[in-house]
Regions:
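A general secondary-structure signal for short beta-strands and their flanking turns/coil
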Residues: 4-8, 52-54, 87
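A structural signal for short, well-ordered beta-strand segments
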Residues: 9-13, 57-59, 90-94
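Non-catalytic surface loops within mature trypsin-like serine protease
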Residues: 15-17, 63, 96
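Generic, well-ordered alpha-helical segments
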Residues: 23, 27, 51-53, 61, ...
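A short linear hydrophobic-aromatic micro-motif
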Residues: 41-47, 89-90
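Short, charge-patterned binding micro-sites
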Residues: 44-64, 98
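C-terminal structural segments of small proteins and small subunits
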Residues: 65-104
Length: 104
């Protein structure tokens, strides 16, 4: 049985009220800080850096069990749904260290 699990989330955000890159980055930096500081996630903006109304984030969470990782991912989804009522899409994958070993 694996001793390490992780969840990778691809988060698609929409900022309809943002009128500039500066406004988007201000809101996005607050979201990234919350994910890092309150939820212990690793976060990177991976697409749409030059778009003022869209952003795509990669979010990674690690834990000792699959259930703890899934609970953490669920908490991230709930936080994002509350913060972005106009719409957010989150795609996720759960894997274990053993899964990585099997890939090579």
């Amino acid at each position: 049985m694996s001793e390490a699990f992780f969840v990778l989330l691809k988060v698609h955000l929409y900022f309809p009220e943002s009128g500039s890159l500066k406004a988007k980055r201000s809101e996005l930096n607050a979201v990234k800080a919350h994910l890092r500081q309150r939820m212990g996630a690793s976060v990177a903006e991976v697409a749409h850096q030059d778009s003022w109304q869209r952003s795509t984030l990669a979010v990674a969470l690690a834990g000792r069990s699959a259930s703890s990782c899934l609970q953490a991912a669920d908490a991230v989804r709930r936080m994002l749904d509350a913060r972005f009522p106009q719409g957010v899409r989150v795609d996720g994958r759960l894997a274990s260290w053993d899964d990585l070993d099997a890939v090579g």
